[in-house]
Amino acid sequence: MKSKKKKKKVTIKDIIRLIVLLVAFSVLLYPTFSSYLNEKNGSKVVSYYDEESVKLSKAEKEQMLEDARAYNKEMLGNIDFIDPFSQEDVEIDARYESLLNVDGSGMMGYIRIPKINVELPIYHGTSEAVLQAGVGHFWGTSLPVGGESTHTVLTGHRGLPTKTLFTNMDKLEVGDIFYIKVLDETLAYQIDQILTVLPQETDSLSIEPGKDYATLVTCTPFAINTHRLLVRGERIPYEEATKQEPDTNIKPELSFTAKVLIVTIIVIFIGLMIAIIYSIRDRKRRKVR
């Protein structure tokens, strides 16, 4: 008679190996999954902003926009630029913080960039707390309500381990579209200039008479941050913009790599559970013998 092949016993070492694999893949997945959760939370913040805006009367919204436009006119020729990422210690006046502050959270609107699939809240100022939460409006520049002779500047971080923010801003090209939503108004901007400058080089952030600009600012090169990447858009009619780049809601998505990691973790977890069950059975059999 042929001898039966002995079944390989599940050892403690096998279980430890599976646990190590499970932990390793979980660590690899954490930044991506955490970023995904933060983006979902950001979408909730944006939705809440829209809900709060709807509660305001037409007269209240018009007054808020009028106050913001009046502020922009007052700021003309009265701007002393410094690097947006050095504004941590700048004292911001209470009047500025009250403008476009729909629900008291400091959120004045949000930006949507279809090309890089981001939708981010815009807050007053560029303190580190603000830049960890979303995009900061560079205090001293025009509030993002559009109009002739305005230039709003919005800043965001790149390369945070748990948030995307402006990480992929270097993928934007001249001709791409981004949208800024404030109250009921959606402003469309088409990118017309991309510059890489030193932190102190802020001339390109100045207002040009008759122009309606919005510039996005982030640090570059990635993880080195010695320079600033400036992506400027010029206002174009909303209807014209949507023909080139539809203004649709952006939903956070997990990357293909993240999905593969999740499936791998599930498979390893199931394998670990099976290994533990077999190990327990083997021990019970040995005790019976």
Residue ranges and their predicted role:
Residues D247-R289:
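C-terminal single-pass membrane-anchor helix
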